[in-house]
Amino acid sequence: MRHDRSEKLFTREARAYGGVDLTLGHSRAPHLIVRGAGYLALLLTAVPGSPAVRAVMGPAEWRAVHRQAGSLCARLHEAGALDHADRAEAEAALDAAADGAEKYLDRTADRPTENEQQVFRGYAAQLRRIGPLPVGYIHGDSQPRNWLIFPAGLALVDFERTRPAARIPDLVILAVTEWLDHLGREKAFFQVYGRALTGAEWHGLRCLTALDAVNCPGRGPDNDDAEVTARGRRTLDRLMRQNRP
């Protein structure tokens, strides 16, 4: 049984479970049994395995996990043509992300410095100018704590942020955590993802990491998640070092 924190997240997750198990394959995601809209609750089948974030693995094993994650991510992104409404939402996603991150500047207790805000706004402006990027159905929170390892492979859980969007937001958390000091994991992911990112997508991904850094100091405390807060601070510090004159 899952209880979502808002009607928006409940609606997203319920919709995702309406077909994601077919898209990803047997045992690769929970299956929806029944939904209780009045309680924002979903009754789901159990998925075998344990969170990858808790696993003790060597470099080769982690690369294997990222290959499987790349395969599941590709299946989700290529799940089928978006209808008119979903495509409109997906194509507006990057502008919406820039607008949403701007709002976080005004509500976070750990407010970025003036220089940090200037760097962030520069990336937000660049993101708005990138133009059309490949879109699809994204997981929205793809990372090891939402990957379950079991003998037959890997499963995805927690689909409350699943939505139509540009595809690159699914790579942001991996880019600023898993891949940052482990380039072999990134390479393994893209070996099975099916294609390399375009130059515009790589640039968009960098811009989105800046937005994530600004979101984290607000989103972390909101969800009592110190890991998210720390992630934002690390990313912002790195961006400031890279943007020194």
Task: Show which residues each predicted segment covers.
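ATP-binding pocket architecture of kinase catalytic cores
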Residues: 1-88
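Conserved protein kinase catalytic core
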Residues: 8, 51, 147, 164-166, ...
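Glycine-rich, phosphate-binding/catalytic loops in enzymes
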Residues: 17, 60-61, 155, 172-174, ...
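A glycine-centered beta->alpha junction motif in the catalytic cores
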Residues: 43-59, 102-107, 210-227
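An alpha-helical support segment within catalytic cores of ATP-dependent transferases
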Residues: 59-63, 78-140, 232-235
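Active-site acidic catalytic loop and adjacent metal/ATP-binding pocket
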Residues: 124-171
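Active-site activation/catalytic loop segments of kinase-like enzymes and analogous catalytic loops
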Residues: 169-197, 209-226, 237
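Regulatory N- and C-terminal appendages and interdomain linkers associated
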Residues: 242-245
